[in-house]
C-alpha cells in the first residue's frame, strides 16, 4: 500500500460537550449503536500493527471524536508505545488530535509537545460568540477552559491550529472573530461550514448557515485576509490556501475541495471502518480493521460505490466558468436526499459570487507565492 492515513474515533461519539450544531451527534443517532465506548487496547494494537505493516513511506493517525481526549492520556501513551513496537519498517509517523480543549492540562500539553502531535483546537471566536453554541453537557460555558488550552499549548510549544465553525451567528461577526484570533496571534485558521443534520431540510435551525450569510462571510473574511497579506502579515486560512493550491497545482490537499471522494479510512472505536467522517453510518460500514487488510477494506463494493457516487457532475457545473476552481465542492453539501443522486452544492451561489469578487486578488496572491 502507499502512505496511509486514518481518522480514528477512540471515544466513539462520546463527548463532554453538547454543541448545538454537532454533526457527529446527529449522525450517531441514526446508527444501531450510537456509541461504541472507548477503544479497547486489543483494537488499538491491531490497528497500529496493521497500518505500520501495510503502509509504505509514511502514515498518519488523526484522532477525532466525539472528544478523543475522553479516551485518557494513558490511551495515547499506549499508542506511542505500540507505534515504537511495531514500526519495524521505520516509517515516518504523523499524529494529530482534534479536541474541544476542555480537558487539556499540563500533562496533556507536555505529552502532545514531546510526541509532536499537530492539534486542531475547536474555538468559535471570543467569549460571547464561542459560548453561544459550545456548552458542556451541563449547559455551562466552555470558553475559559479552551482559552486555558491555548495558553498551555503556547507554553509547551504545541503546534496547533484553530477550528472555527461558521454558523449564522459567526458569519455576522467575522470582523470581531478575525481580530480576536489576530490579537491571540493564531496564525493557522480553519473556518468550517456548519452542517445541518444529514437528509434534513437545510437552513431550518437557528445556527444554520444559509447561502446568503455564507457569501457575506467569505467576502468579509477574504478582505481581512488579503489586507494582512499585502501588509506582510500572512495568516493561513485553510480554504483560501486550498484555492491557491488549486490555482497553482490544479488540485487541493483539502478533501472537500476536489469534487470527488476518496476513502478516508475512518475507524470507530470498535474497529469498524467507514469511507468518510460525514457518513459513519451502518449503511457505509466497510468492515473491521481487526480482520481485514487496508487493501481489502479499500476494495470493498461499498467503498467503490461510495466513491463512484461522487463522480457524477451536475449539468449546471459542466457549463460553469468556476468549475475548475470549485469542482462542485464537498459531497456532503450536495447530498440532500437519501438514496438519490447528488444535487447542486447548497452553497453554489455563494461560491459563484465569492469567486467573482475575489478571483483577481487570488491570482495576485498566487503569483506572489509561486
Task: Indicate residue ranges for each PLM-predicted region.
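Radical SAM enzyme [4Fe-4S]-AdoMet core and its adjacent flexible, acidic
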Residues: 136-144, 151, 155-256, 260, ...
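Short glycine-enriched, charge-decorated loop/helix-capping segments at active-site entrances
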Residues: 33-38, 132-140, 205-208, 335
Amino acid at each position: 500500500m502507499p502512505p496511509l492515513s486514518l481518522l480514528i474515533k477512540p471515544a466513539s461519539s462520546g463527548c463532554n460537550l453538547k454543541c448545538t450544531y454537532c454533526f457527529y451527534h446527529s449522525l450517531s443517532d441514526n446508527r444501531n449503536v450510537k456509541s461504541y465506548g472507548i477503544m479497547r487496547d486489543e483494537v488499538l494494537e491491531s490497528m497500529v500493527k496493521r497500518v505500520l505493516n501495510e503502509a509504505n513511506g509514511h502514515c498518519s493517525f488523526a484522532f477525532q471524536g466525539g472528544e478523543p481526549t475522553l479516551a485518557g492520556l494513558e490511551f495515547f501513551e499506549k499508542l506511542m508505545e505500540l507505534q515504537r513496537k511495531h514500526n519495524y519498517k521505520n516509517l515516518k509517523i504523523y499524529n494529530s488530535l482534534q479536541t474541544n480543549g476542555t480537558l487539556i492540562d499540563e500533562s496533556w500539553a507536555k505529552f502532545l509537545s514531546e510526541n509532536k502531535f499537530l492539534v486542531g483546537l475547536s474555538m468559535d471566536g471570543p467569549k460571547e460568540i464561542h459560548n453561544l453554541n459550545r456548552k458542556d453537557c451541563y449547559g455551562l460555558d466552555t470558553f475559559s477552559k479552551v482559552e486555558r488550552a491555548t495558553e498551555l499549548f503556547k507554553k509547551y510549544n504545541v503546534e496547533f491550529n484553530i477550528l472555527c465553525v461558521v454558523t449564522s451567528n459567526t458569519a455576522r461577526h467575522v470582523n470581531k472573530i478575525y481580530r480576536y484570533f489576530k490579537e491571540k496571534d493564531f496564525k493557522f485558521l480553519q473556518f468550517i461550514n456548519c452542517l445541518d443534520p444529514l437528509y434534513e431540510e437545510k437552513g431550518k435551525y437557528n445556527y444554520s448557515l444559509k447561502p446568503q450569510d455564507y457569501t457575506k462571510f467569505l467576502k468579509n473574511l477574504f478582505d481581512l485576509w488579503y489586507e494582512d497579506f499585502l501588509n506582510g502579515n500572512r495568516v493561513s486560512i485553510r480554504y483560501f490556501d486550498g484555492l491557491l493550491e488549486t490555482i497553482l497545482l490544479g488540485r487541493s490537499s483539502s478533501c472537500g475541495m476536489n469534487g470527488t471522494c476518496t476513502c478516508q479510512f475512518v475507524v470507530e472505536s470498535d474497529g469498524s471502518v467507514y469511507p468518510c467522517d460525514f457518513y459513519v453510518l451502518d449503511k457505509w460500514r466497510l468492515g473491521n480493521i481487526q480482520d481485514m487488510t487496508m487493501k481489502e477494506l479499500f476494495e470493498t463494493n461499498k467503498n467503490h460505490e461510495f466513491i463512484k457516487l461522487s463522480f457524477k457532475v451536475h449539468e449546471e457545473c459542466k457549463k460553469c466558468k468556476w468549475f475548475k476552481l470549485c469542482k462542485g465542492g464537498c459531497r456532503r453539501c450536495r447530498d440532500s436526499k437519501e438514496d438519490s443522486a447528488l444535487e447542486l452544492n447548497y452553497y453554489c451561489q455563494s461560491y459563484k459570487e465569492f469567486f467573482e469578487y475575489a478571483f483577481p486578488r487570488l491570482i495576485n496572491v498566487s503569483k506572489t507565492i509561486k
